[in-house]
């Protein structure tokens, strides 16, 4: 009588034969980008800060004005000390009697961050409405410069020849042009007329600054896009498109432009931070947004008069600029790492 003995190898083969083959799900490009971005805690935090900034500027500002019962340009006589004429500090209350209302009226006005200067305007509301101005200048100027830069970079990088030469020389001219002197001259010659251009929905001065930043800022994205297109124009998919008879315009629009989405997104966030900082600097010097329209820069311009005693007038607008520019820069760094295929998942 023979006895059948199953060896370990035989048992293993029998078990394995009943196991379903494991399927590996391929991850798409944007899914990989999201996974890399999600694992960067600093980038996620920066994105949250940027979202909060937009919410505070465009939803929080009108809501706060409604709840407080006054606007950013409302002047309060009791917003300044009647003896020293210095602005009141944070969390100051102005009673109904001081507002000229019936003293028995229950209502009173709260200045959360104090007043902004000798006019006694609400610093908190002016910072919120100043965020609208800074973000509008940053976003619109970045949109204009990126659109113009992408067009110029595509033309120069793909067509080459005399077009590349002309655009490259134009980039060099714009890079070295003293745009600050141009802004000063423009402010003197046509300042009031340009500041009144609002397009029906922008604060005064925003369109002018956005236009100037576009004209003198497109060279940066143009140089980046030109370099990317130069590295792509000899790839196989471009050669295949040429062999099928696709026109240059179709190749640039349908084959090259989709590959520029990643650098466009990354560098747009960095350019927004640069434009916000430039607007604040010009407004501080009196060359940007004019009073009474609130801007972080022109809020800081009044701070030197009170920096020894009312230091909050310097601290709060300065913190707003610091947090905003840092958030956009860190977000740009995180997006750059997320779009980099060499980054680990």
Q: What do the PLM-derived regions correspond to, one by one?
A:
Residues 1-146, 150, 154-155, 162, ...:
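Gly/Trp-centered helix-boundary motif
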Residues 119-345:
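Alpha-helical transmembrane segments of integral membrane proteins
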